[in-house]
């Protein structure tokens, strides 16, 4: 016999929570690390704007942006699909600020040595800079996983066909009271 809440198998909800949390965290930390590296190490017009945008995203309350998010996701046709995970860059602002600070303090001589050896910009990032940032990335990944694992509102609104444990436990609690 399976454990059910409102007709949904709890093991399926557990799997949905795992892919939502780990996938969203991995995607969020990866995009933050690439963006933070480029903004911290390369000089181009708009660097300050990107940094400011990351700060602003931390100031906007998430709940206040749900109506506009729902409208955009509906227009894109990604409501109730796993593609919604692409938009879920968990904690982008916080991750970006932490990684930006890390890459800003990292010496550029490592990259110069890679360039002298014939490495491309991508190879320098993936083979030299990213491995040095792995402790920071690991910490941010764990924080993002916990944040997404505890998320109730967004999966409940945008991924109704993929219920997570938090929504299943809420339904279970409602049935028991």
Features from the language model and the residues they span:
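A structural signal for multi-pass alpha-helical bundles of membrane permease subunits
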Residues: 1-177
């Amino acid at each position: 016999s399976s454990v059910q809440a409102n007709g949904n198998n709890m093991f399926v909800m557990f799997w949905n929570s795992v892919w939502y949390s780990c996938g969203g965290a991995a995607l969020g930390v990866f995009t933050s690390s690439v963006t933070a590296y480029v903004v911290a190490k390369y000089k181009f017009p708009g660097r300050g704007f990107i940094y400011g945008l990351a700060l602003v995203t931390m100031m906007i309350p998430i709940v206040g942006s749900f109506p506009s998010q729902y409208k955009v996701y509906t227009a894109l046709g990604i409501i109730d699909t796993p593609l919604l995970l692409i938009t879920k860059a968990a904690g982008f602002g916080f991750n970006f600020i932490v990684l930006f600070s890390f890459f800003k303090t990292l010496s550029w001589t490592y990259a110069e040595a890679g360039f002298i050896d014939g490495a491309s910009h991508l190879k320098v990032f993936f083979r030299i800079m990213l491995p040095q940032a792995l402790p920071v990335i690991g910490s941010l990944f764990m924080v993002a996983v916990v944040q997404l694992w505890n998320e109730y509102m967004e999966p409940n609104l945008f991924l109704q066909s993929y219920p997570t444990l938090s929504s299943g436990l809420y339904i279970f609690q409602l049935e028991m009271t």
